[in-house]
Structures are given as C-alpha cells and as structure tokens.
Design a protein with these regions (language model features):
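Active-site helix-to-loop segments that bind/position phosphate- or nucleotide-bearing substrates
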Residues: 4-93
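Internal, well-folded beta-alpha domain core
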Residues: 91-245, 250-257
C-alpha cells in the first residue's frame, strides 16, 4: 500500500532528526527550472501570486534568490515540511527501518518538485497549484505536472502493492490524471468527521491531524492492506462501517444523536 500526502506550506531549514540516507528528487531538473522562473518575480509580485502577506513574500523572495546557491540549506522532505500533518506524523522516533519503509510506501505532492519520496532532499520554497509560469508553457502547475507525474505515480503505487491510501487534500488530485489512477489501481480515501448536533461535520484541523496520525500508524505498523486501516483509532476517531464503502473509509469522533 502506498500513502499519498500533500506538501505543507510551512518548511524548516534545520532538523534535529537525522535521516539514514538522502536521495535526489526524481524531478530535480524541473524543480530547478521552476525555482529559476519564480526567482524572476519581485516581492510585490510574489505577494499577489502566492496570496500571502508582505512578510511571507519577502521570505520566499529570498528563498528563490538563494535556491541555486551551494550554501542553501536542504533537508529530506519528510523533515523539511512542518505543517500540522507532519507534526502529527512526527518522525522524531523513526528507526532506520521506519524511514526505509516510508521511502517505499509514502509519497508527498509538491508544486515545485512534483512527487517526492520522504528522503528526497529539498530546498525551502513556496508555490501554489494555480500559479502560471509563461516560460513553462503558460500553464498552471497542476497542468504542468499532470503529464509528468501520472505514469510515475501509478508505477509507484503498483510497486507498493497496487493499493493507494489517499490522505492528500482534494486539490492534489489535479496533479495527476486521477481517472487513470482510479482505473489502474485501487484507491481508498479515509475521511474524518465529527458528530456535531446530530450531524456529521468536517473540521479542517482535525482532518489534518488525523491524516498525520494515520500516516504514522501505517508506517509504524507496516500496514499493507486497507483492512489494516480499520484498526486506526485516535482521539475518539474510529472506523464507522455503516458510513464507509470500498473506496471511502469514514472515521468519526463520537456518535450521532
């Protein structure tokens, strides 16, 4: 089983965790070209393009200016991203075996690097899927990557057993020809909902935390079968068979009234 996670907007340049080995991103050349094009934008342009405040725009202007410099810090992707999902995944106590298993059974989406393995070494950046770079065919990052990633992604899923546990956000489907993905491999999408006033509600922060916790559960337990996911429980979230089907695994917190 292969797990797919979304990249995070926040990144770190240092980590106390030491990975057992580093690998080169498979789309390093494309990432370098994208970063080069992004380095042409001014701070004001980045602020508008990335829909961020001035402080974040300045930070990422500096990142892109230094992206190709030899001294620019880099980290394995699993340690570089610092969003809620990755805080909950929490690889601080990962053994060498855990990292090696993750390398084969976890993939991270990236608008800059395309598709990453956990130990692929990356540099800090920020990018959105709807950014259009004229020098790269005047298309969005979603369109740019779709033709490049789909075959590689399907091959990765097949090598991991032919089953995809999709824990990425919905927008990340647009990085791939998702109809082909669903046709050629089995896709299971866990959902996390909270009972509120007798109705199911989706709370973004709980969804992100649960995605990180479930990924940790899968990697630590070497879960290779969708049925293994049904044993996941965290902070009251448990598998709800009555709301689930073969493609959608629903986990709820609490009971309906």
């Amino acid at each position: 089983m292969l797990v797919l996670l979304s990249c995070a907007k926040t990144m770190s340049e240092t980590s106390k965790v030491k990975a057992p080995l580093n690998t080169v991103p498979r789309f390093q050349k494309e990432a370098s070209e994208i970063a080069l094009q992004m380095s042409q934008f001014s701070v004001d342009e980045l602020e508008r393009l990335l829909r961020v405040n001035a402080k974040i725009a300045v930070e990422n202007y500096k990142r892109y200016q230094a992206f190709h410099a030899e001294a620019t810090p880099e980290l394995p992707a699993l340690l570089a991203y610092t969003g809620i999902v990755f805080k909950r995944l929490n690889p601080k106590d990962f053994s060498v075996e855990d990292f090696e298993y993750a390398q084969e059974h976890l993939r991270l989406t990236s608008f800059c690097y395309g598709l990453l393995r956990p130990l692929d070494v990356i540099r800090p950046y920020r990018l959105e899927g709807d950014v259009v770079l004229p020098e790269l065919g005047n298309q969005t990052m979603f369109s740019y990557w779709q033709s490049r990633l789909t075959d590689v992604f399907i091959q990765d899923v097949r090598q991991a057993g032919g089953i995809l546990c999709n824990l990425a956000s919905d927008e990340m489907k647009s990085l791939f020809d998702w109809k082909r993905v669903e046709k050629e491999v089995r896709v299971v999408t866990p959902e996390f909902h909270v009972w509120k006033n007798g109705k199911l509600a989706t709370i973004v922060v709980y969804t992100k935390m649960s995605r990180g916790e479930m990924t940790r559960f899968i990697l630590k337990n070497k879960a290779g079968n969708p049925d293994d996911l049904k044993g996941f429980s965290w902070e009251g979230f448990e598998f709800d068979e009555s709301l689930s089907d073969e493609r959608k695994f629903v986990f709820t917190n609490g009971k309906g009234e």
